[in-house]
């Protein structure tokens, strides 16, 4: 009998986002404004590397005049028709996995971006049969919906990780790729286990996380790594692989106090 293994890999891509950093000065010098825009700022820093176009400006909520309250207007770099560096890595990885006879799940998290439709278009243009599982499919029907698509020959399933975090067996898909992550540790852990069920017969399931180095995506993943490291120690699981290996958590008590 083959022994089963579950592997987690992180893949980083480099990209410059210098044009967003000027907001840091505002956040450091005006606490009142910072409290109002911090969430929008962090979301922008996380999403911009994946989609460097089409973002609304961040405005000072205490200045009513629209022509004077723009704190940062993210510069458009390209358009939806351009292939982004992460797209290239994703498509190469999917191509390799399909050649090995596997099916692939691509998880996306940023609901305000056009990621799912764009990736579906890219895959379709390459002749890959892909499907998008969205929230329009009722929760109780999602597993049946996926099974039907598999029988129809779908090789790549694109969905939001939050839609499959509980209750689904997705054993037909043995490669899981997080194109981006919502940085919710519970959702990540649940979604990453959808293909690693008790009735899984494949010898291995591989999980990949794509991120741009030296960006908010990178920092958030390191934070999640520390949380995952702490969680697995509490549960009695010690791991030096995958996401947990990104953690610089040395002292468990200190890390829990700082980041949980």
Residue ranges and their predicted role:
Residues 119-123, 146, 171-175, 191-193, ...:
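Short, glycine/charged-enriched secondary-structure capping and boundary segments
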Residues 168-181, 205-209:
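A short beta-strand element within the Helicase C-terminal
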Residues 9-13, 17, 145-146, 191:
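A structural signal for short hydrophobic/aromatic patches embedded in well-ordered alpha helices
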Residues 1-8, 27-157, 162-168, 238-260:
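Conserved Helicase C-terminal RecA-like lobe
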Residues 157, 176-177, 195:
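Short, well-ordered beta-strand core segments
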Residues 135-138, 180-185:
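Short, acidic/turn-prone active-site loops that include or flank metal/cofactor-
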Residues 183-192, 196-260:
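A conserved SF2-helicase RecA2
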């Amino acid at each position: 009998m083959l022994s089963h293994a579950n592997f987690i890999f992180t893949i980083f891509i480099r990209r410059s986002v210098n044009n967003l950093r000027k907001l840091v000065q505002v956040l450091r010098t005006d606490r009142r404004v910072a409290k109002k825009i911090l969430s929008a700022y962090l979301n922008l820093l996380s999403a911009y590397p994946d989609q460097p176009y089409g973002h609304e400006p961040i405005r000072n909520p205490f200045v009513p005049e629209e022509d004077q309250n723009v704190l940062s207007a993210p510069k458009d770099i390209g358009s939806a028709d351009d292939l982004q560096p992460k797209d290239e890595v994703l498509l190469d990885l999917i191509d390799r996995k399909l050649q090995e006879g596997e099916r692939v799940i691509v998880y996306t998290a940023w609901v305000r971006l056009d990621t799912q439709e764009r990736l579906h278009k890219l895959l379709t243009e390459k002749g890959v049969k892909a499907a998008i599982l969205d929230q329009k499919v009722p929760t109780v029907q999602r597993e049946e919906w996926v099974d039907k698509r598999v029988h129809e020959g779908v090789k790549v399933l694109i969905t939001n990780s939050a839609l499959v975090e509980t209750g689904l067996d997705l054993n037909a898909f043995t490669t899981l790729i997080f194109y981006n992550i919502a940085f919710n540790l519970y959702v990540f852990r649940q979604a990453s286990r959808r293909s690693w069920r008790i009735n899984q017969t494949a010898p291995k399931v591989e999980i990949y996380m794509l991120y741009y180095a030296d960006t908010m995506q990178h920092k958030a993943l390191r934070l999640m790594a520390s949380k995952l490291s702490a969680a697995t120690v509490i549960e009695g699981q010690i791991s030096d692989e995958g996401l947990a290996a990104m953690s610089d958590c040395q002292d468990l008590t200190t890390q829990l106090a700082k980041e949980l």
